[in-house]
Amino acid sequence: MRTASFLCFTFIIFVSQIVDNSEASFIIRRAPKKPLSPVIFVPGDGGSQVDVKLNKPSTVHIFCTKATKEYFNIWLNLELLAPLIIDCWTDNAKLHYDNVTRTTSNSPGVEHRIPGWGDSETVEWIDPSHAKQGAYFKSVGNMLVDNGYVRNVSMRGAPFDFRKGPSELGQYFIDLKKLTEETYDLNDHEPITYIAHSMGAPMLMIFFQQQTEAWKEKYVKRMITIAGAWAGSAKAVKVFAMGDDLGSLGLFASEMKPMQISMPSLAFLLPFPAVWKPDEVLVSTPRRNYTHSQLNEFFTDLGYPIAWEMRKDNLKFVENFAPPNVEIHCLYSTKMKTVEGLRYKSNDLSSTPELIYGDGDGSVNLRSSQACTLWRGLQKQSISTLNVEKVEHFEILHNEKVVNYIKDLMIN
Ligand SMILES: *[C@@H]1O[C@H](CO)[C@@H](O)[C@H](O)[C@H]1NC(C)=O
Ligand SMILES: *[C@@H]1O[C@H](CO)[C@@H](O)[C@H](O)[C@H]1NC(C)=O
Ligand SMILES: *[C@@H]1O[C@H](CO)[C@@H](O)[C@H](O)[C@H]1NC(C)=O
């Protein structure tokens, strides 16, 4: 059977060669493949490597490293996330907000860099040692390479400092435009397919809003988003209040919190008004409710008004939910318990709230991962969706249906 179908397949190729190329010689060649659209991966929150170099005036514990000659990887280096050492790590990874310049900087004596610009390797694997937990765009990347893509030529990566919000990432959008044009030139002027995860989706929305229609028609084939946090997530409210343990890495949310709440990206990712109504309750206490339009009061009462300052810096990006005007494929998951709100049993916001759950992928609420469909009828380019049920926000990157969908779109 197998032989028969193989022969039949060969025959079709042979005949089509003769028909297509009647003047050519009768040599059996493989049918010309459709040209591959080069890929640029755009990672999400936590999806890029971060290296630091230290020359610190002081450290939080005596055993913390004070100075290093070279840059070393801190994200996602699981050794540095061990108990005790995590305090050293937090001080090296966290940002400090300046409410006058409206920008963040590292702790004194910490220099950072995001390695691997243009390369796919550092977004295929977040952990340079390629530990299993650090697998990121690996499954999609391997599938593409198996089908003819070449790392660093037709498959690129656009990592960024995910700790920051778009208000501080202006240079990233400029660099992404350059990388797009360079990749287009490197690949016989084939338009680009962008593949984004999580926060990468709204980052690309902003990027495309900034480009002219002519530029997009020339350089952009499509965007594919996986678990896109298009319109933020209620989980960001939870992280500001309690921190997050990053799933099953054996970490404590409370230990991760000081680093996490210092990130303007977390304030950017608070629920967007595109899919949250102003009077929707996000946090409740016996005394009062905090609605979407009262998040600023929540952060004041939480004793962390900086969160709202960082949000204000990014409001113009959050509030402009205009269509990107490119072909979109939104791949997402549902039916995983996803935080929708917090309910405190006491009026003390330092107590532990009960989490209210709704539908989503465990991190991003369904209404946000589906928000791409709000642009149907508002842009002429098509918007397709794939819902894979019961797959977690990071696991979905390795989901067979997702990988096959991308394969069908890109290769077959
Ligand atoms: C800025 O920060 C300083 C010091 O933390 C604080 O005293 C001041 O009230 C803040 N200003 C604004 C506008 O938030
Ligand atoms: C990727 O390409 C760039 C520029 O073409 C080059 O500088 C870099 O070393 C390459 N990286 C790898 C891993 O080949
Ligand atoms: C908070 O909102 C809920 C509806 O979401 C309402 O039933 C409740 O009475 C409100 N609580 C307070 C204290 O206003």
What are these regions (language model features)?
Residues P264-N347:
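Glycine-rich, aromatic-lined ligand/substrate-binding cores of catalytic
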Residues R2-I195, M199-I261, F268-L270, W276-D279, ...:
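N-terminal non-catalytic accessory region
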